[in-house]
C-alpha cells in the first residue's frame, strides 16, 4: 500500500535583525507583494515590517504567517493609527491608489508604490506636491537602475560625456493574457516604462523631445523572452 505524501508547506522566512530599524507597514498581500516586496524586505536588516493589510483575510494570514508579520489588518487607516509606521508600501491596483497614497502622505508616512503611481499625470504631480509639502519621501519600483550592469553603463555614459540621442526597445510576451487590471494600465505604464526610466537614468539630464512607436508582433505562441 502506497504511503500518502505529506503536503509541503512554504518555510517561514527568517528575518534579519538590526539595532537601528525602520518601521514598515504594507498594504496588499497579493501576488506582486508576496513574490517580490515581502521577500526583499525580509532580506533588509534595517526593515522592521510591523504590520500588513489586505481585504482578503486568507491571503493576509498566509502572507503574514510566512513572513512573520505580527500586525494584521483589513483597514489600512486603523493599521497606520495603531502601528505608527515610518513608511508604508501601498502595493495595489492603480485606479485605487491615488486616494490611499494621498492619505498616507498626509499622515506623515514615507510612501513606496508600484508603477504607475497614479492613473493620470496630474494625479502624480499632485502626489509629488503633497509629499514635498509634508516632507516625506516617496519611491516607485524602478529597480532596473540598481542592476550592476546598468550602473556600469551609467558610469560609462558619464565618462564619455553628454548624451544627445538615445534609443530603447521593449518587448513583452502577451499571448493569452488579459489586460492589466481590466484596462486600468496599458503596456507602456505597466512594463515599457522600465525602458524609459532606465534610459533617463543612463543619459542623465532632462528629456527635450521624444519620438515613439509601438506595434504588435502577433503569434500563437511566445516567440521571445528577454529579462534584465
Kindly give the residue locations of the regions a language model identified:
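Alpha-helical elements of Rossmann-like donor-binding domains used by nucleotide-donor carbohydrate transfer enzymes
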Residues: 62, 78, 87, 99, ...
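A contiguous active-site-proximal alpha/beta segment in oxidoreductase catalytic domains
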Residues: 118-176
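Beta-loop-alpha module in the N-terminal Rossmann-like domain of NAD(P)-dependent dehydrogenases
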Residues: 67-128
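Short catalytic-loop micro-motif centered on adjacent basic/acidic residues
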Residues: 90, 111-114, 138-142, 211
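Short active-site oxyanion
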Residues: 47-51, 86-88, 138, 185-187
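Rossmann-like dinucleotide-binding domain that binds NAD(P)(H)
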Residues: 176-228
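Core-facing hydrophobic residues within beta-strands of well-ordered domains
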Residues: 47-49, 163, 207
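N-terminal Rossmann-like dinucleotide-binding module
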Residues: 3-4, 8-67
Amino acid at each position: 500500500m502506497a504511503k500518502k505524501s505529506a503536503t509541503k508547506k512554504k518555510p517561514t522566512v527568517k528575518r534579519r535583525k538590526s539595532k537601528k530599524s525602520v518601521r514598515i507597514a504594507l498594504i496588499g498581500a497579493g501576488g506582486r507583494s508576496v513574490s517580490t516586496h515581502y521577500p526583499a524586505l525580509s532580506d533588509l536588516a534595517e526593515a522592521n515590517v510591523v504590520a500588513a493589510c489586505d481585504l482578503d483575510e486568507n491571503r493576509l494570514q498566509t502572507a503574514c504567517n510566512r513572513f512573520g508579520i505580527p500586525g494584521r489588518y483589513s483597514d489600512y487607516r486603523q493599521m497606520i493609527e495603531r502601528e505608527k509606521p515610518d513608511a508604508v508600501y501601498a502595493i495595489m491596483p492603480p485606479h485605487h491608489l491615488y486616494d490611499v497614497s494621498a492619505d498616507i502622505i498626509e499622515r506623515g508616512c514615507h510612501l513606496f508604490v508600484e508603477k504607475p503611481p497614479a492613473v493620470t499625470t496630474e494625479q502624480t504631480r499632485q502626489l509629488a506636491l503633497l509629499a514635498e509639502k509634508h516632507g516625506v519621501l516617496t519611491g516607485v519600483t524602478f529597480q532596473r537602475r540598481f542592476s550592476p550592469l546598468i550602473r556600469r553603463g551609467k558610469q560609462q555614459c558619464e565618462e564619455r560625456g553628454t548624451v544627445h540621442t538615445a534609443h530603447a526597445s521593449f518587448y513583452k510576451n502577451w499571448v493569452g493574457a488579459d489586460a492589466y487590471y481590466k484596462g486600468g494600465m496599458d503596456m507602456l505604464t505597466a512594463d515599457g516604462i522600465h525602458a524609459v526610466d532606465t534610459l533617463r537614468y543612463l543619459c542623465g539630464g532632462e528629456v527635450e523631445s521624444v519620438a515613439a512607436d509601438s506595434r504588435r508582433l502577433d503569434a500563437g505562441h511566445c516567440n521571445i523572452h528577454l529579462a534584465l
